[in-house]
Amino acid sequence: MLINNKFLKYLSFFISIVFVINLIYMIYSSFFIVKNQFTDIGDTTYVNQVREDDYTIKLASYLTKNCNKDKLCEVQNLLDFVTTIPYKINDSIAKSPKQVVEQNFGDCDDKSNLLISLLKVLGYEVYFVLVPEHIFVIINLDNLNISKKALYVNDKKFYILETTATLSKIGFPLKYKLSDIEAVIDPFKNKKILINNLEYK
């Protein structure tokens, strides 16, 4: 049937244009979600849920308000907060920091997303380390001398932060062989760090 009514013709044209624009927007958005949240690690794909939003900034400020800019105090306070959140395996996609806090549980992915986000908004250099079936956070604390072994990535010292061990301390011992390390990731740029040299000493 031919459409003789001009109004209906223009309406259908308008609806078609809106549909096409919406479709293009969804494809464009999906591309950036994949680009910014998914990283290929060998045979698997890592999905990050890190945030630098107002919620994370306010929470980090609140948790470190009594530290007076003391870095060890800030990092340990944030680590204590995250490690006291109950560990529970999450069979779905990793949760955002806010979801971990509100639901009061998470696995290593979830709790590491929370910790690394809190540290990042305070300006710390932090990365994820992926090992078989686990993930942990590493932090560079500049010239602070802690009497603990550290992971040296390209000759730069990083202390291990373990989110699944209740009240663990900065400089948690490496429980894996160096050869088990699948990747070191900057989740805020969603890219793997090129590793030329890796030591634990």
What is each model feature region?
Residues M1-K201:
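A structural boundary/capping signal
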